[in-house]
Structure formats: structure tokens, C-alpha cells
Amino acid sequence: MKVYVCFPEGKAKALTMSYDDGKIQDERLVSIFNRYGIRGTFNLNYGMIDKEGLIPPRIKSSRINELYAGHEIATHTMTHPTIARCPMTEVAEEILADRKGLEQITGRIIRGHAYPNGSYNEEIKQLFRQLGIAYARVVEPAADFTLPTDPLEWHPTCHHDAPDLMEKAEFFAEFKKK
């Protein structure tokens, strides 16, 4: 038996974008995504929402549901620590509080994550499995379009400022299912 990986509506490829921290610049970014039918995952820190004095400012809780409608919300910890340096109890508290707060605001079940500062290890991945986190994005790019073998170590293809971004975009646009 053959198993074929496909995306919604049987599509052979998917473009996803992932941005962290819920910065005020998301207002403009989401409007561009919406204009072109691009969907993204926005990894938010519940502990920074509505906090005054942050530079750049963050999206207010009152704007989250409207702004990110049609996009995914994922965890990014409460306070953005470098979690591989933290005791596991603190990591669990950071994730659970972030998830609970985001679920309270959005009314959605939150299952994704992006590691703050790209910080993770095997012990953290095991903890995330126990906490119900289904996937987590790392910082280091994979430089290809393959799906991850470990969803808790999901490497992006590239970053938006990658020198070879346009080459990758052209390859992706020309890709045809065989």
C-alpha cells in the first residue's frame, strides 16, 4: 500500500509563514497575507500581551481574534526565556500558562509552538509531548521543502531575509506533483 502526503483539498504543496512575539508590525503583515491568500502561524507570548512599554509594542488582547482570524495562533512561552537554561518545572509553567491564556483569549485549542531564541533539547521535546504540544518550530533552516521526521523539531525552509529566498520561491512556484 502506498501512502501519499497531501495538503487540504488534495494540494501537493503548501506555503506557510511563521512569525513570533505578536509585535505591532503584525497588523501590516497580516493585511498583506490576507490580500494574497497566505496563511500564517503567529507564535504569541501571553505574558507580553497588553504589557506597556515594550519596544516594539505588542498586539493588544482586544485585537487578537480579529487580526489573526483565519491564521493559526501558537505558543511561544509566557515571557520568552531561553528555555534550555530553565528548570523543567519552569518550562512547563511557561508553556501551560501561555497556552491557557491564549486559549482563553481565542477560544481555540492551541497545539503549536515556536521555541524562543531557538532554545530546546530532547528533555524539552519530551515535556512538550506530555503537555499536548503537537509540533514546534526551531530556528535553523532545513534549506529544503521536506516535512519533518520529528514534528517537535520542525525546521523552516528559510527565513524571510535569506539570500536565496527568491530562488527557493521560484522553485516552490514551479513545483508540480508527479
Where are these regions (language model features)?
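C-terminal active-site subregion of NodB/CE4 polysaccharide deacetylases
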Residues: M1-S31, A92, L96, E103-R108, ...
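Metal-dependent polysaccharide deacetylase catalytic core of the NodB/CE4 family, i.e.
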Residues: N34-I124, P141-W154, C158, K178
